[in-house]
Regions:
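C-terminal output helix
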Residues: 107-116
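Conserved acidic carboxylate
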Residues: 9
Length: 125
């Protein structure tokens, strides 16, 4: 079965980066660039993993994480929060909202894939 990843990112270059990395892994992808469309995308796509930018247009990533985790149908989906605002208090608040993992931008391919492997329960390469 193909791993399904929902990429939530408003920056085109970052979306292209994630798409290229995950395509090399053979993951099935859905890309969303606007916070207002995320909850519908989660329901329609049923991802195995969500990568979530925290600063999005219309709805914050932190709020979306809380909503996804509150819903019994989506609460089990691991969410990797990715943000350019990488203060210790930011990370704590994002994890309290329900993020399973956290990465600060800029990030490397290895950092991204190691965290994804951990969240999906796959051996780290």
């Amino acid at each position: 079965m193909t791993t399904k990843v929902l990429i939530v990112e408003d920056d085109l270059l970052n979306r292209m980066f994630y798409e290229a990395v995950f395509n090399q892994r053979g993951y099935e992808l859905m890309l969303v660039d606007d916070g207002a469309r995320v909850l519908d995308a989660v329901g329609d796509f049923a991802p195995d993993l969500i990568t979530m930018d925290i600063h999005l247009p219309h709805v914050s990533g932190r709020k979306l994480i809380r909503e996804i985790k509150r819903n019994p149908e989506t609460a089990q989906i691991p969410i990797l929060a990715i943000t350019a605002y990488a203060g210790k208090r930011d990370e704590e608040g994002i994890r309290r909202a329900g993020a399973s993992g956290y990465l600060a931008k800029p990030l490397s391919i290895d950092q991204l894939l190691d965290e994804v492997d951990t969240l999906l329960g796959e051996p780290v390469h």
